[in-house]
Amino acid sequence: MLNQDFQHLREQHTIASPIAFVGIGLHSGRRVIMRILPAGADTGISFTRRDLPEGENRFVALWNRVDGTELCTTLSNRHGHHLATVEHLLSAFSGLGIDNAAVAVDGPEVPVVDGSAMPFVSALINAGIRPLGTPRDLLVIRRPVRIQQGESWAELLPDHTLRVTVSIDFHQQDIGLQCLSMCVSPNTYSREIASARTFGFAENVWQLRRRGLALGGSVKNAILLENGRVANMEGLRFPDEFVRHKALDAIGDLALAPAPIIGHYRANRPGHRLNNDLLRLLMSDERSWQRVAAADLLDGKINGLDQAMLGIGLEEATYGSDTSHAVRSEKLSTWREALDRVLGRTDGDTP
């Protein structure tokens, strides 16, 4: 019997009622009004800029529409217009399993709210998440893909769920070396990732603002580090809040794939450019992924895949919180063998 926690993965979802936000753009510094509206099945996440002429103001949230990755993820459209800082909202949609929504903003940037995704998550949950009765597809990673830029690298590996493993290493005393690894589900996302805030360094602020960036940044919407120490009076929400925010960003950037990814994202010192380049590399090689119906995977209908071998959703539901490393390894080995059969891999194909 399939665990009840997995049922939401079978079909697409939207929100049950509209949501409104008023906030500041992190980089533009402009006041922004944003509304999020329910949307029909198979429409995906779309954005509209209400300050632009009709017919030129629509943006589609897809990997190949990204046109800027400096300090945020920026979408563009065929008319040459841009919409910046979409990653935190996309992360919230993805983390909660929302496939379809229409977002309207009255400026060039999504509001930063408190620098995390938690205000979005809270509002989306309060609005209600509504199933649409339409099957959901998943993008299953078949073969590893990896990209490296200097000391930074990122890769996607076959796995039973969306798992993120991120490491960062900063010389600032209050950051240092931090690592995080977890399966992503609505529960784990809301509890462990969504409230982690973006961060910046006091020594960079003047230079960024000269370039028209970080004009709306403050300790109200970011962690500020000064001389290596956290300057925010309230301190950190997690001891490793910095790497948790990197995971939050990665989930938002990966949400630009054409369907929710089932695979293991691993990265060292990632950024928005690295994440988007990884998606571009993935999509350029059709051997590295397969688009499948979520229900078929969950029900074991694809070449006899047993539903218990593809525990999508909660890490506790997959292994149990007290499962030993040896048992985990045995389960993963069994799962990988099943996945090889499902995807038609032979021993010679296995990376």
Task: Place the predicted regions along the sequence by residue.
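C-terminal regulatory domains involved in ligand/effector binding and gene-expression control
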Residues: 1-100, 104-351
